[in-house]
């Protein structure tokens, strides 16, 4: 069940069963619609705590009032508690969700060294030729290398890639198309997957002929499988709630740390507003300040 479908059912529940006021029902409907958009209309079961925190944190950065943010927190906690109670999800990701305070940092990002270690390990595993290992390595290299949303990655077709130019054509929020670059490691990982991994996966079933990344049964790889992959590989270092968006956060932060132009990063990420991208400059500044405090004798 998608988060949109579940949200519609919950809004009906609070209106008909809990009999909340019409104004509160309208507010909850709006809040949950915003959450669904932020989560890229994913399956309800794929939404995790980090995404919920990230969504609320963005509201803080926009300057939304304390009362509005508190209401959104209540709406989300009520929604997921109801979803768990009614069997729509097996676990409630909002149990540890609290109203964020102003100044809260971004959800945790992986360091460049941490990601290098993970990707090096996956590359070594992929050299054995297992189709799933080749795919998994290519997935993580491209997620991080191109700073993609999980929906953008899962929606890629083989024809969307230009390995010579190292670019991918993706469809982002609002069905907006953009071309994003990726580096040599991602290009080599994808090439190896296309030559040695994907053909083996494609033989298992029909229906994924155009899709770049195929699942174990030969169809298009879904967001849930990508979430499981990222959690398995990055969870030990970043926490059990880590998801694909952590790689996007990390890529944006590392680009700015490396001196990339803010507007270039905006285009890579597909942000409609430069203000959304500027959030990552706060992270870079905080990292610099932390390094200063640790290293400077007069800090």
Segments and roles (model prediction):
Residues 1-299:
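Conserved catalytic core of the tyrosine transesterase superfamily
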């Amino acid at each position: 069940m998608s988060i949109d479908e579940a949200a519609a059912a919950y809004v009906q529940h609070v209106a008909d069963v809990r009999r909340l006021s019409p104004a509160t029902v309208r507010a909850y409907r709006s809040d949950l619609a915003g959450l669904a958009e932020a989560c890229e209309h994913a399956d309800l079961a794929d939404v995790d705590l980090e995404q919920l925190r990230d969504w609320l944190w963005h509201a803080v950065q926009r300057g939304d009032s304390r009362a509005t943010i508190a209401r959104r927190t209540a709406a989300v906690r009520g929604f997921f508690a109801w979803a768990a109670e009614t069997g729509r999800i097996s676990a409630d990701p909002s149990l540890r969700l609290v109203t964020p305070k102003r100044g809260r940092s971004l959800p945790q990002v992986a360091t460049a060294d941490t990601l290098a270690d993970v990707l090096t390990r996956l590359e070594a595993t992929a050299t054995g030729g297992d189709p799933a290992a080749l795919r998994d390595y290519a997935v993580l290299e491209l997620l991080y290398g191109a700073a993609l949303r999980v929906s953008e990655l899962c929606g890629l077709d083989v024809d969307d890639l230009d390995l010579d130019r190292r670019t991918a054509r993706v469809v982002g929020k609002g069905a907006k198309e953009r071309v994003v670059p990726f580096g040599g490691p991602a290009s080599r990982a994808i090439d190896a997957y296309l030559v040695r991994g994907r053909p083996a996966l494609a033989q298992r079933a029909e229906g994924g002929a155009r899709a770049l990344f195929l699942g174990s049964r030969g169809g298009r790889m879904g967001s849930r499988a990508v979430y499981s992959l990222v959690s398995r590989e990055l969870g030990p270092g970043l926490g059990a709630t880590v998801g694909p968006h952590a790689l996007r956060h990390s890529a944006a932060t590392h680009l700015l740390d490396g001196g990339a132009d803010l507007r270039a990063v905006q285009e890579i990420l597909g942000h409609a507003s430069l203000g959304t991208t500027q959030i990552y400059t706060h992270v870079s500044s905080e990292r610099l300040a932390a390094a200063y405090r640790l290293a400077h004798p007069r800090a």
